């Protein structure tokens, strides 16, 4: 027995000693950032991957709250009151998501930048290497732009983080802006003017100029900053590479996403295997139209109604609907019957009795004129539901002034309704009619980050602040003529005496509502 025990103990000892070598893993096929970005294919995929990071931001729900929501042109949905009563703190999930997304992407940019700056990559010629570096610096600058606008002093890592770091050091606002300018100026000098069709979506020299114009306009530390803002915007305008499309209806046609007006866009695809979470913005501006009428149900054409952002009464008041085509082109304010046949009992303002109404597919069912109508106007379209501005509810509802079987002689017809946080005319810029079914979340619409109409308005702002109101009016009029109802182009034009910062802000709201600019516009103009 003693001999057996000695043999057993010896065997276990040998096993323990040999197990150390047995458990040591040699990672012959392990891929790390360090070696992946040192090949031509690896660094090419790395740069392309930086564009994919932009999908993590454009347009997620949190970005809407950060860039559009807390402003004069939007009213928020219940459950997101923090954004509209200015009680945001570090526990807010949207803020955390924004912060995490930006810094995760910055770190990815830094890894690519470090590899490009420090490695001789076989097969990668100097021109392509420089272009890759310019693209990477632009995207990093874009994230820093968002971060410094939202938070002021921020951590500004310029090297990749490869291990856990438990402390962070803030960089002063001025230093962050200086780095953004440095990166964007490098991009302007080294990005191409155009790409092959197969590389559509990559950042061009003119996209970088547009971004620099916005940055210098934001800084406006001196007359020289304003001069640079105007110069960069005018270089884009005069390049001959871009032109305004004919109308907003054409601009927002989802089948026209690679149009002549777009300077830079984040790309999505209908291929579900490649689209990831997709573009979900189609849900957030859409009202709950399917909850108001028995014959109107969810359909792809009208969108998936998550009701997150409602345009304010002030925003709607900015549109002269008689001569500004942007109202009809950019908003849904009329809904047709979506069902084949629905029978409803409705109270008639004519007979003062309940009558049977058979709704048929395609006929008009609801209108939100976003302005007061008289009882006579509402009666004329009966039984179509008419949604009056919400403030009118206080004047009418408490008086029981809407007709019904119990109240047949009330002043307001039975088809009178009121807008609410759930039901309203809504923006169509993000709707996605190419989704395979109505509840499909992962949209495929491209996001237009920069477009030429914005460039014209940046140029107008820079010109006005430089003392040239005439030039500002000329640039604004280019945008307004395109926006005119046909035949009203001359009426849409303004004079130099009309130009003020407030007018420019109003025009930016009319033109760019819902495109992730509003809060930065208000912040820039105080």
Task: Provide a role label for each language-model segment.
Residues 337-342, 346-477:
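C-terminal substrate/ligand-recognition segments
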Residues 20-22, 59, 63, 89, ...:
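Long, intrinsically disordered, low-complexity segments
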Residues 1-29:
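Bacterial Sec-dependent N-terminal signal peptides
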Residues 21-77, 206-209, 214-393:
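An aromatic- and glycine-enriched ligand-binding surface/loop that stacks and positions planar moieties
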Residues 146-149, 153-155, 215-223, 467:
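Short coil/turn linking the two alpha-helices of tandem helical-hairpin repeats
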Residues 39-40, 44-57, 78-151, 171-178, ...:
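Conserved, well-structured interaction surfaces
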């Amino acid at each position: 027995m003693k001999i057996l025990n000695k043999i057993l103990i010896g065997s276990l000892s040998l096993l323990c000693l040999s197990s150390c070598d047995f458990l040591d893993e040699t990672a012959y096929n392990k891929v790390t950032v360090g070696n992946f970005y040192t090949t031509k294919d690896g660094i090419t995929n790395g740069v392309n991957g930086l564009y994919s990071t932009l999908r993590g931001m454009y347009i997620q729900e949190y970005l809407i709250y950060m860039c559009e929501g807390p402003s004069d042109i939007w009213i928020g949905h219940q459950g997101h009151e923090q954004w509209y009563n200015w009680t945001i703190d570090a526990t807010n999930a949207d803020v955390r998501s924004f912060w995490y997304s930006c810094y995760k992407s910055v770190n990815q940019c830094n890894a690519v930048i470090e590899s490009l700056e420090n490695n001789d990559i076989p097969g990668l010629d100097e021109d392509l290497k420089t272009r890759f570096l310019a693209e990477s610096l632009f995207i990093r600058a874009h994230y820093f732009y968002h971060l410094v606008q939202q938070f002021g002093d921020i951590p500004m890592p310029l090297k990749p983080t490869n291990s856990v770091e438990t402390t962070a050091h803030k960089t002063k606002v001025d230093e962050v802006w200086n780095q953004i300018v440095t990166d964007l100026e490098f991009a302007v000098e080294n990005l191409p003017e155009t790409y092959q069709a197969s590389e559509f979506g990559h950042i061009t020299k003119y996209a970088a100029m547009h971004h620099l114009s916005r940055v210098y306009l934001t800084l406006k530390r001196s007359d020289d900053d304003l001069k640079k803002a105007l110069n960069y915007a005018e270089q884009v305008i005069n390049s001959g590479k871009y032109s305004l499309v004919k109308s907003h209806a054409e601009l927002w046609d989802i089948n026209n996403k690679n149009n002549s007006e777009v300077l830079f866009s984040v790309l999505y695809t209908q291929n579900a295997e490649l689209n990831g979470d997709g573009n979900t913005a189609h849900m957030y501006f859409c009202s709950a139209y399917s909850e108001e009428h028995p014959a109107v149900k969810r359909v792809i054409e009208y969108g998936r109604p998550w009701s997150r952002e409602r345009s304010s009464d002030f925003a709607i008041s900015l549109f002269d609907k008689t001569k500004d085509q942007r109202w009809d082109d950019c908003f849904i304010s009329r809904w047709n019957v979506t069902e084949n046949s629905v029978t409803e009992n409705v109270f008639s303002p004519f007979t003062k009795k309940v009558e049977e109404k058979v709704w048929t597919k395609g006929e008009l069912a609801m209108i939100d004129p976003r302005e007061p109508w008289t009882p006579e106007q509402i009666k004329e379209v009966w039984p179509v539901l008419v949604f009056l501005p919400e403030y009118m509810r206080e004047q009418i509802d408490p008086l029981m002034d809407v007709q019904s079987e119990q109240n047949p002689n009330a002043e307001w017809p039975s088809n009178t309704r009121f807008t609410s946080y759930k039901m309203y005319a809504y923006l169509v810029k993000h709707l996605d009619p190419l989704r395979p079914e109505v509840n499909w979340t992962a949209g495929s619409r491209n996001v237009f980050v920069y477009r030429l109409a914005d460039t014209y308005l940046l140029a107008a702002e820079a010109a006005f602040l430089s003392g040239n109101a005439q030039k500002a009016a000329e640039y604004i009029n280019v945008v307004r003529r395109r926006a005119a109802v046909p035949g009203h182009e001359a009426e849409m034009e303004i004079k130099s005496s009309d130009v003020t910062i407030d007018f420019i802000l109003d025009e930016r709201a009319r033109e760019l509502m819902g495109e992730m600019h509003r809060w930065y516009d208000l912040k820039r103009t105080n």
